[in-house]
Amino acid sequence: MKINLRDITQANWLDMIDLEITKEQEKFVALNSEAIAASKFYPYYINKGIYLDDMPVGFIQYYPNYDDGKPNEIFIDQLMIDTKHQGKGYGTKAISLVLDEIKQLKGINAISICYVEGHDVMRAFFERFGFSVVEQDEFDETIMELHYA
């Protein structure tokens, strides 16, 4: 069994909508339907399904950080693993694949994420990959960054 990433297309977007998070997690992550809908208005958003072989288990969205005037930075906006598949290492493998994919992009030298204050699990998760806290934004979210050459 192998984790892989797939582009979100007309053929698989409903699979992403069917993925679920716990009620508690709803305060930390947007619904996949909202993230996919937003990407239709921002063509530079990249949506990926996280699959275990051919079974959808999660979703990730990232994009060049044009909104903050940082075109050389990729912002990972959404990462979720379905409740039935959490705690199995799929998120760790998926983020490793995404980081490798992003590092291949020309002109990109940083990756950032944000998490809602109090979501210590997310902070610890990204610290394992070398991200460090850089600021607290006006929305009470903590910004973490990873810089590379």
Model-identified regions with their sequence ranges:
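Active-site beta-strand termini and strand-to-loop segments that position acidic
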Residues: 52-53, 146-148
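Conserved beta-strand-loop-alpha-helix junction that forms the acyl-donor binding cleft
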Residues: 112-123
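Acetyl-CoA-dependent GNAT
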Residues: 2, 7-77, 82-84, 95-97, ...
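Active-site acidic-Proline motif in GNAT/NAT acetyltransferases
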Residues: 82-84, 88, 117-118
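Conserved catalytic-core motifs of GNAT/GCN5-like acyltransferases
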Residues: 114-115, 127-145
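Conserved GNAT acetyl-CoA-binding A-motif
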Residues: 104-114
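Residues forming the Rossmann-fold NAD(P)(H) cofactor-binding site
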Residues: 92
